[in-house]
């Protein structure tokens, strides 16, 4: 990929690719990034053990910044996860245990490390400073700098109240905690840039303002557009559920298929955001029409899957899509999965079959599916997926859960 030098306007590149919604000081930030390596942070509350494609825009933005020589920080909200960000939510989140939070932190860090190079000090937990600050101390350090009148004007809070949904004091204080996070990261790690979705604008502004009022460093904020697909669905979801970046939650094949099946209108935009192709090539692919646009969708699927799961997984998924589904569908409308008689004679099991075609991520995932009754041949549950398949499988329907069904076809 082409990486801009510090003398070039990195912000212009990010704007061209569609990463920028708002900046607290666009020209000041451009000059700050051009002046030398800066430290930027992206924060996640540890509400799940993986991230999904709705988070991918931030990961790619951080990747571009690191490629340009800047330092990434991953802030995990070990403390704020106990509260939950009320931004544009109608209800509070359930409270997690410490063990659940730690397991989620470990999972998020694994996903993050596939997109940026993490060092020993790249992962930060805000429990490091929030767990030790007393209530009265926090009010003195932070609370006195904020007006309730102004906080009530922020969209995230105002919309919640306008809908007459309850907003606890615990949640109301979240924005102050996030502002404090930014100031502490500036003080402890020299961090000067916070990244976030457009719904985080108020929280980011509060951090910038808090640093100014306390006489700290000049801080910057950059928000990304909140992504939705052209058919109106929130990015991160599919008809089958969340599109996770962790192979244990979603098989690489299904991840690849998500991108391959995207709306024609989204191809150019997604290539700019979720691949590292030069923009000239992005524009060429995005301008393709009709059947030729499928070429661009395959490029997108390969690029996104290679970043999330590695080149091998991307190739396996692409090969599976070509080999398994190349002949279209039978009268039933189900995809056809081909099996060679020679491979079957070698003792091929359902577990082997699903792994070889990258339809399931691991043997344990296949066994869990079978144990839950979700793996069936012509409607009959398969209790032991490791048993070699018999020759009578030709024409049978293989079901994985309630929504994924395939026809098996034997070939010489």
From Swiss-Prot:
Keyword Transcription regulation present in the record's keywords: the answer is: no
This protein is called Tyrosine--tRNA ligase 1
Q: Tell me which species this is from.
A: Pseudomonas aeruginosa (strain ATCC 15692 / DSM 22644 / CIP 104116 / JCM 14847 / LMG 12228 / 1C / PRS 101 / PAO1)
Q: Where does ATP bind?
A: 237
Where does motif 'KMSKS' region map? 234-238
PANTHER family in the record, alphabetically? TYROSINE--TRNA LIGASE, MITOCHONDRIAL, TYROSYL-TRNA SYNTHETASE
Where is this protein localized, as stated in its record? Answer: Cytoplasm
EC nos: 6.1.1.1
Which PROSITE patterns would you find in this protein's record? S4
Protein purpose: Catalyzes the attachment of tyrosine to tRNA(Tyr) in a two-step reaction: tyrosine is first activated by ATP to form Tyr-AMP and then transferred to the acceptor end of tRNA(Tyr).
Q: Which SUPFAM superfamilies match?
A: Alpha-L RNA-binding motif, Nucleotidylyl transferase
Which positions in this protein are listed as binding L-tyrosine?
41, 174, 178
Identify one Gene Ontology CC term for this UniProt entry: cytosol
Q: Which reaction does it catalyse?
A: tRNA(Tyr) + L-tyrosine + ATP = L-tyrosyl-tRNA(Tyr) + AMP + diphosphate + H(+)
Annotated S4 RNA-binding domain ranges read 348-411
Q: Which UniProt keywords apply?
A: Aminoacyl-tRNA synthetase, ATP-binding, Cytoplasm, Ligase, Nucleotide-binding, Protein biosynthesis, RNA-binding
Pfam families, A to Z: tRNA-synt_1b
Which terms under GO biological process does the entry name?
Answer: tRNA aminoacylation; tyrosyl-tRNA aminoacylation
Protein family: Belongs to the class-I aminoacyl-tRNA synthetase family. TyrS type 1 subfamily.
Write out the residue ranges of the motif 'HIGH' region.
46-55
Assembly, in brief, is: Homodimer.
Q: Which GO terms describe its molecular function?
A: ATP binding; RNA binding; tyrosine-tRNA ligase activity
């Amino acid at each position: 990929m082409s990486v801009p030098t510090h003398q070039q306007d990195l912000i212009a590149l990010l704007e061209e690719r569609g990463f920028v919604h708002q900046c607290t000081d666009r020209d000041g930030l451009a000059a700050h990034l051009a002046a030398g390596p800066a430290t930027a942070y992206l924060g996640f509350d540890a509400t799940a053990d993986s991230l999904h494609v709705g988070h991918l825009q931030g990961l790619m933005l951080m990747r571009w910044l690191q490629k340009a020589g800047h330092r990434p920080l991953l802030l995990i909200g070990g403390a704020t996860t106990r509260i939950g960000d009320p931004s544009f939510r109608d209800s509070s989140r359930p409270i997690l245990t410490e063990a659940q939070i730690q397991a989620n932190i470990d999972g998020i860090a694994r996903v993050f490390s596939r997109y940026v190079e993490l060092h020993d000090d790249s992962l930060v937990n805000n429990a490091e400073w929030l767990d030790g600050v007393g209530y009265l101390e926090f009010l003195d350090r932070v609370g006195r700098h904020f007006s309730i009148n102004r906080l009530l004007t922020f969209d995230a809070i105002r919309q919640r109240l306008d809908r007459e949904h309850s907003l606890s004091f615990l949640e109301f204080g979240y924005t102050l905690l996030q502002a404090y996070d930014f100031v502490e990261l500036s003080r402890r790690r020299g961090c000067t840039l916070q990244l976030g979705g457009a719904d985080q604008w108020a929280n980011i502004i509060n951090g910038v303002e808090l640093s100014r009022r306390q006489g700290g460093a000049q801080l910057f904020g950059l928000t990304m557009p909140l992504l939705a697909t052209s058919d109106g669905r929130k990015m991160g979801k599919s008809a089958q559920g969340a599109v996770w970046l962790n192979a244990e939650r979603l098989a690489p094949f299904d991840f690849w298929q998500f991108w391959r099946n995207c709306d024609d209108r989204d191809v150019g935009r997604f290539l700019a955001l979720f691949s590292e192709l030069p923009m000239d090539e992005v524009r060429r692919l995005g301008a393709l029409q009709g059947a030729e646009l499928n070429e661009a969708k395959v490029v997108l699927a390969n690029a996104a899957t290679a970043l999330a799961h590695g080149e091998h997984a991307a190739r396996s998924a692409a090969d599976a899509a070509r080999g398994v589904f190349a002949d279209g569908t039978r009268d039933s409308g189900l995809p056809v999965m081909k099996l060679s008689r020679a491979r079957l004679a070698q003792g091929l099991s359902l577990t082997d079959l699903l792994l070889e075609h990258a339809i399931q991520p691991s043997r344990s995932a296949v066994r869990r599916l079978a144990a839950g009754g979700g793996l069936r041949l012509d409607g009959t549950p398969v209790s032991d997926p490791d048993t070699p398949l018999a020759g009578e499988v030709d024409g049978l329907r293989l079901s994985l859960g309630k929504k994924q069904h395939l026809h098996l076809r034997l070939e010489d």
